Amino acid sequence: MIGGCGSLFLPGTKICAVDSPKFWLAYWRSMADSYAHVTYLEQRFGNGAARLDIRAYRSARGAQREGRDTPEAQFVRESHEKRATENDHAKPLITACRTSLMFFEGNSSLEWTFVSPPAMYRSGRKTGTYETLTDYIPLRGDQNDSGILEGRLKGISTFDFAIAIADEAERRNFREQHWTAWGEISDDEPAPSPYINL
């Protein structure tokens, strides 16, 4: 079963990312700061991306960083971050993914595995390499410290995530476990989304 990153726990806790305003803030800030992620969201959701205001939010964050802030940019940042931490539009879907995991946990009557992508999952180049972790969101730096999440969320390309899933289907290393895989996505160049032609 493939779920969402919100099903993963914050390191050192038993708090799911979906239930953490701190996670949502770090998630949307990381998304907006990446040109590749903004493009990926627009490709994946088409006109629905307009509801996200991701490009306007990206611009407002850039204005603040570059010392050219305006009251309008501040309003965009504050309203977007308030919506992200109080009532993110994606929360119902991610909560549903977490609920589906709960049907599997503790069930030994069938052979199952449940994989969640890391937070910064997007289209990108294929490297063929990845790392794995069970139950927790992968972070840069101290994996056991979830105090500050901003700038620490790891990711993976859609290609490498597919390789990790295929490898698990063959190797079965994560039987009856919830796991994730992450890889190299340091380039910030947009790649064609596999969702465009769906």
Each language-model region and where it sits:
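Oxidoreductase cofactor-interface core, primarily capturing Rossmann-like NAD(P)-dependent enzymes
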Residues: 5-198
